[in-house]
Each structure stands twice: as C-alpha cells, then as structure tokens.
Amino acid sequence: MYAYENIEMSLNYIEQHLSEKIETEKLAEIACLSTFYYQRLFKKLVKKSVQEYIKLRRLAMVIAELNNSEERILDIALKYGFS
C-alpha cells in the first residue's frame, strides 16, 4: 500500500467522525503507521498538521450548517466540539 493510500484511509475516517473526538493515535492506527511517522507524512501530503486539518474541516461543517439550518450557533458549535 502506498503512503497516500494510508493517509486517504485516515482522511475518510476524519470525514465520517467530525462530530466526535478524533485522536491522532487512532488515525495512525487506521493508516497502519506509527504516530510519529503518520504525523510527518500527513503534514507532507496534506500541507497541514493533523489537528489543524481536523479543526478546519469542522469549521467548514459548522459554516455549512449555519447557512442551511435554523439551529442556534451554540448548538452547532457544540455538536462539532467547539466550546
């Protein structure tokens, strides 16, 4: 399996679990890599750190929900782990 395929598996996991707590160790396990190597490879391929990428994806989801929902801002923010 190529390195980008390992990272792609973890990206899929991130997308499916954005409203949950996501641990870097779990992502590394999904990608079949050590945590250290996973973080280095992720940053090299995605051009962002793992946690920065997750935060930006969550912000994008919050923005989309704010535009398409009548839910309160606080409820949407809490749904995606912002406090």
Task: Walk through the language-model features, giving the residues of each.
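Short coil turns linking two alpha-helices in DNA-binding domains
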Residues: 34-37, 83
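Short, basic/aromatic recognition patches that contact phosphate-bearing ligands
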Residues: 30
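Terminal helix-turn-helix DNA-binding modules in bacterial transcription factors
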Residues: 4, 8-25, 44-80
